[in-house]
Amino acid sequence: MLIKLDSLKNNYLFLLIFIIFCIRIIGLYFSPLEVQGDEAQYWYWSTYFDWGYYSKPPLVAWIIGFFTSIFGNSIFILKLPSLLAHFLTSFVLFNLSKAFKRNTEESLWLSITYLLFFAVSLSSNIISTDPFLLLFWSSSLLFFKICLNKKSIKNIILTSIFVALGFYAKYAMIYFFLSSIVLILFTDDKKELIKNILIIFFIVLILISPHLYWVYSTNWVTFIHTGDNFNWNASLYNFEQLINFIVSQFFISTPIILFIFIKQFAKTKKFIQSYSFEIAYSLPILVLITAQSFISRANANWSSVAFIGVTMIAVNVLYKNYKKIFLLNTTLGLAVLILVSTFIINPPNISPFNKLQGMKDATKEIQFLDESLNSDYIVFDDRMNIAKFLYYLPSKNEKLKYLSYGDHPGNHFEMLMPITIDDIINKKIIIIHRYDLPSNFLKENLLVKQMYEMPNSKNNFYISYFE
């Protein structure tokens, strides 16, 4: 009787996962929201194969390219891989929980809790690098845990493959090795663990060598860009940034999940003994990124991989001791899921939703202007704007250029499609610029200037023409 009852309960949990999937698919399919700048940039990268791109490793572009080559370039298809990646991650987390000898019901709850992360409800509607990083991070932890349970060269190789795929998604995969070093401190058989980590490291190095060669051949442009993101040349030691980052972390998963994780530190010795693996692959990352937020700044998602370990601990504690709070956490996650899906289908006129509308009309305006003026080039000074026009105005792609001043390229488009002031002298030019006029030369030669008003004032841009 107990077995049948447990089986019935698990079936309901599977049904809940299916319902979450259906809500997400319906919301994404019927959403009127358009492509934002980063998404358009990733799409443009996907139009040609390379081992790397200006600001990111290549995996997100490869995945977009695979989907769009089969199913077309619709916004739904462009964003769909993120949604699917999150559901694959939930499946991996189910198996990771089972690798810790936790029962089927708890493992299903781990999957559901991940799917109901506040950040996942948003991220499922945006094509970005994070869903794929989380998928391969979780897969790496799964096979590494299996390897620790039962030593096998097959599991070492599988771990290495998933770590390498994680690197191809995002450089934050480096935290795997940082956390593995911390795990050594908690392990009795240190020699064996160090040997396995070194084997994984060298296999990963071989697997990502094509990308490393690409980085070298482009004068380390991606590494330089990644280093610039740390912003250590700006004003240092910011309490405001620190507080903003800490607050943001309570909304990656849910406030309850992070609170339960933090609460366990009151039982330090027992906590470490029970959860050494999960702690090693979460706490060092949170500490490191929190320190970075104080030194300069840190985006909320920089610590996203830490929340796999955080959530594994919190779910185990909630499942064993706090069933009512667990139910409250699930209800909260479902409420946010429904709210986000409602806003995705019927977006309110507030940020960020109104920033993702208006490009189709803007494209028609620019196309009409270009054909009326018979311009030589359509020039941009903002990567977000040029990326969106590359997506929405493919017939004019050869005319689209990025205004360069000859310094180190500041983005992918300045690197691949630059145009200088000298190049546009005596040419008919449409300038689409984000702020005021981008140079004195343009001020002196300007014939027409008007602001194109998008639904959100922050999304406005200026259209200028000169010859």
What residues fall within each predicted segment?
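Short helix- or helix-capping micro-motifs
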Residues: I17-I20, S107-F118, V163, F167, ...
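Membrane-interface alpha helices of multi-pass inner-membrane proteins
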Residues: Y48, F143, L148, K154-Y171, ...
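Transmembrane-helix motifs of polytopic, lipid-linked glycan transferases
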Residues: L80-K101, L116, S139-F143
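Membrane-interface transmembrane helices that cradle and orient dolichyl/undecaprenyl
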Residues: K98-K101, S140-N155, K270
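Short acidic/glycine- and proline-prone juxtamembrane loop motifs at membrane-interface regions
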Residues: A119-L133
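Transmembrane-lumen/periplasm boundary regions of multi-pass, lipid-linked membrane glycan transferases
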Residues: L165, F176-S274, I285-S293
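Signature aromatic-anchored transmembrane alpha helix within multi-pass, membrane-resident enzymes
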Residues: Y319-N346
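Luminal/periplasmic acceptor-recognition loop/helix of membrane-associated glycosyltransferases
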Residues: G358-E467
